[in-house]
Amino acid sequence: MNYITFGKGEKPLILIQGLSTRSIKGAAFSVAYMYRMFARDYKVYLFDRRENISDSITVRNLATDIAMAMDTLKITNADIFGVSQGGMIAQYLAIDRPDLVNQLVLAVTLSKNNETVERTVNDWIHITEQNNMKRLITDMAEKMYSDIYVKRYKPFMSLLAVLQKPKNVPRFIALAKACLSCKAYDELD
């Protein structure tokens, strides 16, 4: 499992990103720059999803992967920040391994699916299977960002479709399907 780490602080901060078309490999500088506000107070870690993913992987399995990585690096009592699919993973991390979690911050995520999420994720899977990357990137942007943001960057969608095209299409589809496995609601305190 690839990961990025930066920061000079003593406290560990685990960032768990959302569903992405690409891995974090080669993105250390840009990630460290985007999250530089945490670098003074925290030792920041951003874990990628593992390379080889089965078609039946769940967000709970992804949480287990992060727990194993944290165990390997001897990270405990960390502040956890999960965004979107990363928030789903973070919830299972807190449920299954509370010893690893000091504080949990969740953003734009859910603890159980609804019809909108199921329809959206299934659309992304179908679009990806059709190899229509411009449509995938445009649809993801329209669903994830504000109208103002999308309008501002609309001229760049063709370029983003090339830059953000999944390098490993089956991996992306498996990770998208994993979003549909989130059922943490009844296990949360």
Residue ranges and their predicted role:
Residues 12, 43, 77-79, 100-103:
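Structural signature of beta-strand start/N-cap positions in the alpha/beta core
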Residues 31-81:
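Active-site loop/oxyanion-hole signature of alpha/beta-hydrolase fold enzymes
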Residues 91, 95, 101-132, 171:
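Flexible "cap/lid" loop of the alpha/beta hydrolase fold
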Residues 1-53:
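Conserved HGGG/HGGXW glycine-rich cap/lid loop of the alpha/beta-hydrolase fold
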Residues 33, 61-68, 123, 139, ...:
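Alpha-helical elements of Rossmann-like donor-binding domains used by nucleotide-donor carbohydrate transfer enzymes
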